[in-house]
Amino acid sequence: MFLAKSLVCLALLAVANAQFDTNYASGRSGMVHLFEWKWDDIAAECENFLGPNGFAGVQVSPVNENAVKDSRPWWERYQPISYKLETRSGNEQQFASMVKRCNAVGVRIYVDVIFNHMAADGGTYGTGGSTASPSSKSYPGVPYSSLDFNPTCAINNYNDANQVRNCELVGLRDLNQGNSYVQDKVVEFLDHLIDLGVAGFRVDAAKHMWPADLAVIYGRLKNLNTDHGFASGSKAYIVQEVIDMGGEAISKSEYTGLGAITEFRHSDSIGKVFRGKDQLQYLTNWGTAWGFAASDRSLVFVDNHDNQRGHGAGGADVLTYKVPKQYKMASAFMLAHPFGTPRVMSSFSFSDTDQGPPTTDGHNIASPVFNSDNSCSGGWVCEHRWRQIYNMVAFRNTVGSDAIQNWWDNGSNQISFSRGSRGFVAFNNDNYDLNSSLQTGLPAGTYCDVISGSKSGSSCTGKTVSVGSDGRASIYIGSSEDDGVLAIHVNAKL
């Protein structure tokens, strides 16, 4: 027993510190989840919008062949049939081209990978033409047979770690990641994506797999492909989906030695704050004091594709595009604050939580339509193209690693702070105006508020803020304004 534990510890140590670097290009920060976008459209978006606006990466939807389900719900992408790169988003050639084109403009690609399970019963035909028999645990496209799965049982008790990790999540056939053949197939799949130039992975349902098995899989992965601009010896950035709101048998701390985790507490807490259930003044110690994992272990977000639909964690407190004022405020705070690695959600609009992406014919995904103001139509929300969000990605890039300084609050729901002497933000979530002289920490001058507008040459399309020689400025945010936030930085100086 001692030997087995020692081997697990050695495996964990071998992986330690390798998976925490995002592999972002220099001077960039902020990832966007282009949920259900096609590969060709993502490539164009990298070149036309994400690259020029300072985004660092894209999380893409699952790349492997999935079960074709009636009505084509979004969640069919999470029911693997094989590891062939053939989905509604495109084929392997299109995927490879996208990765190459995005890397060429400094935007990294992170793949949502699924190897906890295979498709549930009913998933007999895949997007790449493969067939399967989930009822007999036969997936010839890999191939997997019943020998590669855990015994059939349901997860009914989240206080039983064995059940959570060895039984089936909502009927999805549960792979045995301790099986050496399964490990070989998973590593082969991930290594192929590394060869194609990806920078990392979001590991779906990591909580449902044993950390020791994941350590073995991660530890076997190739270094990143230097042909795509990665430094020699770079490892894939690993983000593990681990929902830990406390009170269950499985803790995120079991996974943070292996890679980052999806910090759902951040989503839940930021939703409560900007919905008015907690006061903004309490954000003064935002971070691990709120129960979050360490900053370099936390992928943070306002919402994700699951919890914007009431799945996952957070419930009714989660903010989504459907409450735009508060959503933009929460997103601006996330991007202005140094904690964690932020991921912006880019959604399609939905009224039914099973609804799939916009299509041209009920099956083929439609491309987003872009309006003159950068926003999207055609059923796509494109939060990443909202000025209040993409300008805050530029803010984050501008302030870099500068610390929070000059914190101010009114004892309620009005706050402001600077990031060193490079950026300043103020928020008003009270039902009365914010009208105060505040210390911005910035050099004297006139600045463009990048929330209400953008700098255009030597002018500003939105509000301007005059900072005096003492660093102070009169800050006004009316309670009835469209945006409850104001942001200025040194690259928006007029």
Curated annotation (Swiss-Prot):
Gene Ontology biological-process annotations: carbohydrate metabolic process
Keywords: Calcium, Carbohydrate metabolism, Chloride, Disulfide bond, Glycosidase, Hydrolase, Metal-binding, Pyrrolidone carboxylic acid, Signal
Catalytic residues of the enzyme: D204 (nucleophile), E241 (proton donor)
Residues that bind chloride: R202, N304, R343
Residue numbers binding Ca(2+): N116, R165, D174, H208
Enzyme Commission number: 3.2.1.1
InterPro entries registered for this protein in UniProt: A-amylase/branching_C (IPR006048), A-amylase_C (IPR031319), Alpha_amylase (IPR006046), Glyco_hydro_13_cat_dom (IPR006047), Glyco_hydro_b (IPR013780), Glycoside_hydrolase_SF (IPR017853)
Enzyme class: hydrolase
Gene Ontology MF: a single term: metal ion binding
Record-annotated disulphide pairs: C46-C102, C153-C167, C376-C382, C448-C460
Residues marked Transition state stabilizer (site): D306
Chain positions found as Pyrrolidone carboxylic acid: Q19
Domain of life: Eukaryota
Signal peptide from the UniProt entry: 1-18
Catalyzed reactions: Endohydrolysis of (1->4)-alpha-D-glucosidic linkages in polysaccharides containing three or more (1->4)-alpha-linked D-glucose units
Gene3D superfamilies: Glycosidases, Golgi alpha-mannosidase II
Similarity field: Belongs to the glycosyl hydrolase 13 family.
Complex and partners: Monomer.
Listed name of the protein: Alpha-amylase A
Gene for this chain: Amy-d
